[in-house]
Design a protein with these regions (language model features):
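A hydrophobic alpha-helical transmembrane-helix feature that marks the membrane cores
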Residues: 1-231
């Protein structure tokens, strides 16, 4: 079985592609640019949520529809990107990513106002290092990450349930943060490898970038949580 055949049950088009294939360099540049766009959206969202006008919206309850709408639109964007990768539709994939990146970035930015700039910078550097290391490991040891992917997903669900219980008990969740970091670091390795096995088309680059963006953001936010408790 070749590398691509292992993912034929997913949304990626592995047969005749409707979208034009790019060079590997262009494919990687597009993914990097899209991930950067996602972080930029998060930065804009962090600025917006730190303003007094947003604070007044939160106090009045007017921001709740915005939060709920962002969550719904994030799901809509993900569905659009998955459908676009299946159909190899360039336009649908780009629209889906714009919706996903802007709304998910806004939602993820809500907690940034609780941290100072040095803490955010430290978390960003640590996240970049983890992304580089596990991305390289994912390409070097793909079979390992394929084997542990399902296990990691199960651990993630169990950890989230434990966190809900600990939240009501008022117990520190540093250990669960570390577990989630390890799990999503593994996802970075897995998704990086998958990105190298699919046809290098724009719709595939968009979907792969969104997967990696979610992985990276979760690592980043969990590191922020840990560093914030130490301040």
């Amino acid at each position: 079985m070749n590398d691509i055949q292992g993912y034929q049950n997913g949304p990626i088009e592995t047969g005749a592609s409707r979208a034009k294939e790019m060079s590997p360099r262009a494919y990687n540049l597009v993914m990097s640019a899209l991930i950067f766009l996602g972080f930029s959206a998060m930065g804009v969202g962090a600025y917006f949520t730190s303003t007094m006008s947003f604070a007044r919206m939160m106090m009045s309850g007017a921001a709740l529809p915005l939060v709920f709408g962002s969550f719904i639109l994030t799901i809509v964007g993900m569905v659009m990107m998955s459908a676009a990768a299946s159909k190899q539709s360039v336009g649908l994939s780009l629209v889906g990513y714009v919706i996903f990146a802007s709304t998910f970035g806004l939602t993820a930015s809500f907690g940034l106002a609780n941290y100072d700039l040095p803490t955010i910078n430290t978390a960003f550097i640590a996240t970049a290092a983890i992304t580089f290391v596990f991305g390289a490991l994912g390409v070097t040891f793909p079979k390992f990450f394929q084997r542990v992917y399902g296990i990691g997903f199960g651990i993630l669900l169990a950890t989230i349930l434990v966190e809900i219980v600990l939240m009501f008990m008022g117990v520190s969740q540093t250990i669960t943060d570390l577990i989630v970091i390890v799990v999503f670091a593994g996802f970075i390795g897995y998704d990086t490898y998958v990105a190298t096995t699919v046809p290098p088309t724009l719709p595939n680059a968009v979907l792969m970038a969104s997967n990696l963006f979610v992985d990276i953001i979760n690592v980043f936010l969990r590191i922020l949580n840990i560093l914030g408790r130490r301040d």
